[in-house]
UniProtKB/Swiss-Prot annotation:
EC nos: 3.1.-.-
Function: Endoribonuclease that initiates mRNA decay.
PANTHER family, per the entry: RIBONUCLEASE Y
Xref: Pfam families: HD, KH_1, RNase_Y_N
Membrane topology annotation: Single-pass membrane protein
KH domain boundaries: 209-272
Subcellular location: Cell membrane
PROSITE patterns, per the entry: HD (PS51831), KH_TYPE_1 (PS50084)
Organism domain of life: Bacteria
Domain HD: 335-428
Stated name of the protein: Ribonuclease Y
Provenance organism: Protochlamydia amoebophila (strain UWE25)
Amino acid sequence: MIENQVPFYLLIFLVGIGLGVLTFWAYHRFALGGFKRISKDIISRAEQETSELRKTNELSLKQKQVEYQRELEQMWQQERKKLQQEEERLKQREDKLESRMNLVEKKLSDTEKREAILIGRKAQLDEEKKQTIESHSKLLSILEKASGLTSSEAKEILLSRLSNEVKTESANLIRRIRKEAEEEAEKIASTIIATSINRLAVSCASESTVCTVTIPNEDMKGRIIGREGRNIRALERETGVNFIIDDTPGAVVLSGFDPVRKHIAKMALTELVQDGRIHPTRIEEVVEKATINVHKQIKQYGEDAALRAGAMNLHPDLINLLGKLKFRFSYGQNVLDHSLEVSHLMGLMAAELGLDIRLAKRIGLLHDLGKAVTHEIEGSHAIIGHDLALKLGENKEVANGIGCHHHEMAPLTIEADLCSAADAISASREGARIEAVEEYIKRLRKLEEIALEFAGVDKAYAMQAGREIRIVVLPDQVDDAGVVNLARDLTKRIEQELSYPGKIKVTVIREKRVVEYAV
């Protein structure tokens, strides 16, 4: 049975092989033909797109070429326009140069003509000069024969007369110019000073080397003295002030030349009297406490003064020195009040003159700084103040204003000059200062002595409490021109040798009297 089925399976196998070969042939034929068609379609579309892209690029290139040609045309037109403008400008310059050349040639021609005329005139003048010299020689010879004098002798006589006339005229001219300048300066200065003083209001204070402390009863005097005087000795030792206990009812007198110590002593004694406990140990405690309080007051006085004057960023030591000025007096005038007054005056005058107001007020506030330490450092208070200001951080302008306010150094700024004026105004105003009688008499005598030292001075009188000096000269020794010179020289001597508030008027009198007797 199996043998009968083998041919059948073989037949089926052969049929399968045949169908497979037929299928492969059919697939290969139809599939290969489809792929070729697809590839042809792709190639065709690619060629079409390439053609369209080439046409588009050619069109874009033509458009860009047209635009570029248009831009080149515009640039060429612009360059051509610029060249035309430059050509026009050069042509105008050539025309101007040509006109200038013509003008120069014309001027040159005129100059040559003038030069020729001048040469002719020079020759003519030389001839006239020669004739004039000859005529002068002849006239001089005739004059010498007629006068009996040589030309040199005549010149000496003429020069002598002219010299005297010139001296007289120059003295008169100097007197007139100086008078006019003084009047004008007086007007301007009076206006500025009057404006400043009218805007200034200050209080007056007087110096005193003694002060009193009120006590409740006479028994307190004994307690202050203490057993065998130990309490009063402790007070004087701790404070450095003399305690005067006499018959003055209800008061103890404190005497001392250091105002700070005197103030400390007054505060300490006042507290001791109020407390009632008075013995050496308690005295030491109270004096130490009073010293601390006074130093706090000094600092407060300095800060208040700086604030009132608008002086910012002062060194702490400068503030303490300013505070000490509250306890110092000059001719009865409180130095700190005087410094504030000078600062205010300088600020007002600086405003009138258009100067630096802050600098002026700062100089005015610090100008008497040296008076706070004059008992500790040798030298004038102006120079001491100058050195202290530089040492404590002030600039050269401020230090110079301090140092030159008594003319001990040259001023560097106008504000420094203002300090001298404001200081004199503050010192010389009514009631500002009180001068001791001995100093007053000494100053008057010195004023008259200086005047009598000049040659030709007959008499000298100090008038108006030393505000004026009147001088009578000998008319035979001093002429009118010499009167002016004498007044000027005497003024300089007074400024150099005397110290005085305000100003001194110098009046020179020359009077010639001729007396004859009829017999």
